[in-house]
Design a protein with these regions (language model features):
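Catalytic palm subdomain of template-directed nucleic-acid polymerases
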Residues: 1-21, 44-54, 91, 229-242
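Catalytic palm active-site di-aspartate
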Residues: 1-5, 18, 30, 34-45, ...
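RNase H catalytic domain
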Residues: 1-2, 209-273
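C-terminal reverse transcriptase regions that engage the nucleic-acid substrate
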Residues: 32-151, 268
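C-terminal functional segments of enzyme domains
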Residues: 39, 43-51, 88, 92, ...
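Two-metal-ion RNase H-like nuclease active-site motif
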Residues: 153-166, 205, 306-310
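A short, polar/acidic, helix/strand-boundary loop motif
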Residues: 175-203, 211, 228-242
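Class I S-adenosyl-L-methionine-dependent methyltransferase catalytic core
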Residues: 305-384
Length: 384
């Protein structure tokens, strides 16, 4: 009650000062009684529950205009598209950056120059499928996302640093209250290596989150990158189709794994370890040609799993890798039983001995490919 009385006293003072100054307050728009819930600036402020929401009439108008858009496809006006974009972006105080990421292609459609009110065949637009995906997203999620908690702060639990070079990316992660850390390294596909620096840095962020999936799931993550554009695009999206797709992959990963990520730029001088990881050349990463594999497979195949590979060198649909990479079944081939599989084995030289012992321990079968090296320590293991 003391708080209410104090607030009422402040309200009376302001009202009195306005009158003394010769100003007339608009009584229809003024609230002089303390309240914890009101609609202001197009937003519903609920200080009792500490939430911000978009008023239902605004939500209904957005859903209505989205429905009109779908009904009129493929012929719509830029006036209609602009109306949708404006309504979506106006949700940002309540839904956050998703309003920007999930409206980028609709925004780009606005620049598809045409008469303002003349029906336009949007199916001729390069990003028409993506525009339709964004419309469907807001039809499905507009109501679900319409709430923002006030005064809610969660301190980051996991710190991740990433970087990318011309041929690979790397990064490390650790809990804030622990000294132990984990790291990842991944070589790029030849096509990925041709991307610009923004594209490679975006891949580094995406691959790092996927690699540390078990570590970051359900956590608040602070991720550092030394590329300013990547830090912005990851959170807000891009008009570039390629970069926007990468931003969407990051967004979808976080949504599916309940990860709250804050991406921030830091100078390269503070990102030296991740930078050094991205420049590592893995000389143990070797493989055989497809022609050689096909020949061996014709004699002893088909092989069911490649135990030592990566996404760019795997010879089987199922494979294990040194670090996480796309489609990898696991990151430690020695942690599983090899029995019941026809194993394709092309291990790093320093793991050849362990591979032989693990194959025997599992009672498994497979083909082991090694360099012809009679003076090597592992060579004698074949003649026991």
């Amino acid at each position: 009650m003391e708080l209410v009385a104090s607030t009422q006293s402040c309200s009376d003072t302001v009202r009195s000062d306005l009158v003394k100054a010769g100003l007339v307050a608009n009584c229809d728009k003024s609230i002089w009684i303390p309240t914890q819930c009101l609609d202001w600036l197009g937003i519903s402020w609920d200080l009792l529950n500490a939430t911000l929401t978009v008023p239902q009439p605004r939500v209904d108008r957005l859903l209505s205009v989205l429905g009109v858009f779908k009904d009129k496809l493929p012929f719509v006006t830029l006036h209609l598209v602009t109306s949708i974009v404006g309504k979506i972006i106006s949700l940002s105080p309540c839904v956050g950056n998703v309003s920007l990421i999930m409206s980028r292609f609709l925004q780009s459609a606005v620049f598809f120059r045409h008469d303002w009110d003349t029906p336009l065949d949007l199916s001729r637009f390069q990003f028409f499928p993506q525009c339709l995906d964004e419309v469907n997203f807001w039809l499905d999620n507009c109501v679900k996302l319409n709430c923002k908690k006030l005064f809610e702060y969660s301190q980051p639990v996991v710190i991740v640093c990433t970087d990318a070079s011309d041929f690979a990316c790397g990064g490390h992660a650790h809990f804030v209250d622990k000294e132990e850390f984990d790291f990842f390294y991944q070589a790029f596909f030849s096509m990925e290596s041709t991307l610009d620096s923004n594209g490679r840095e975006m891949l580094a962020i995406l691959y790092a989150l996927r690699s540390f999936k078990a570590l970051v799931r359900g956590k608040v993550v602070k991720l550092y990158t030394d590329n300013k554009n990547a830090s912005i695009i990851s959170m807000k999206g891009s008009m570039s189709l390629r970069l926007q797709r990468q931003a969407l992959e990051i967004f979808q990963f976080c949504a599916m794994n309940n990860v709250t990520v804050e991406i921030e730029w830091i100078p390269r001088s503070l990102n030296e370890y991740a930078d050094s990881l991205s420049r590592v050349v893995d000389f143990n990463d070797w493989s055989v040609s497809t022609a050689f594999f096909d020949y061996i497979a014709s004699l002893f195949g088909p092989f069911t799993v490649d135990r030592f590979a990566s996404h760019y060198s795997a010879k089987c649909a199922r494979f294990y890798s040194k670090f996480w990479c796309p489609s990898s079944e696991g990151v430690d081939a020695f942690s599983v039983d090899w029995a019941g599989e026809n194993n394709w084995l092309v291990p790093p030289v320093y793991l050849i001995g362990r591979t032989i012992f693990h194959l025997e321990a599992c009672g498994a079968r497979g083909v082991l490919v090694v360099p012809y090296w009679p003076s090597a320590v592992f060579w004698q293991l074949f003649f026991r």
